[in-house]
Every structure is written in C-alpha cells, then in structure tokens.
Amino acid sequence: MKNKIDKILSELIGLPLTLTTRAGNMECLKFGTALRTDKNGKTYNVGEFALHLQSPWRFTNENEIIVGSNDLYEQADETSEYDENFNWEEFNANLRDVKLAKLITENIISILSANVDKFGGLEINFDNNIKLTVFPDLASKADNEYWRLIDFRNEKTNHLESWSTGYETD
C-alpha cells in the first residue's frame, strides 16, 4: 500500500496550488487546472487534484503559521473587537478564507514533495519554504475520514483517502 500511496503523491509534484473552496468547515484545495462545465454551461476549475481536509491543518513557512484550519472561527479583521453576530460560515467573513485567498493570489507555490505518516497525517512541501501539514488528532477508532485526495485528470475520478482505520484507494 505504501508504494501505491507514494506513486499517487508523486503525481502532485510540480502542480501549483490554484484555488480553494469550502463546504462548511471542510477546506477543498485545488492543485493544477482541470476545467469542467456544469449543466448551466458555466466553466470552473476543479483542479487536476483536489484535497478535501477534514482534520486540523496549517500552512507554515520558516517563521510563522500562515493560516490554519481553526482560523475559520476568527473574524477576518484581526484588529476588530469581537462581534457576537460573527458568522464564520459567510464566505470571506473569517480569517481562514481571507488568508488562504491571500496565499494563493500573492504566491505561486508549486508542490516539491508529499508524504504521509502512519497516523493518517499528510505533509506537502511547496517552493518558497511553504509547508502544508495535516495532522489528525482523534484517538477514536471509529470510522473518521481525515482527508481525501481526488484525481480529476480523467473521466473517472480516483481517490486516496486517509481514515482513522488506515488508507484506502480506488
């Protein structure tokens, strides 16, 4: 299984982080460009690969945490006083949405390497000394999905999934 995972992850090398979307608190990172057209004729980028994150994660450089998963629950304006009506679900109202957009628009970062660990974690190294670390933090042995990498390059999508019970591919 390790060889299969390494082969899949090696296909990410050289792809840029091009887009991010969100479904609730699940971040969806897009690498490369793969265009699809919906039933209304609108064209959009699904990425050659999409990484759906359902575990804690963070982007770092050598000096700081650039953005982390829990920034979703912080207001976009870091200097404003707490707003009891703050709605993290509103797009771009939270710090995570704003900082991820800034990371993508102000940097062209491409993948240099990607590795998994025995606990379901994932580390992706980008150029410019930027790193994405996904670190599952559940001790539960119940079926919990940590992250999913989806390959959109072909008609049939392939998935690499990290679960509390191990890795799965199709």
Task: Label the model's feature ranges.
Residues M1-D170:
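Surface-exposed, interaction-prone regions used to assemble/regulate multi-protein complexes
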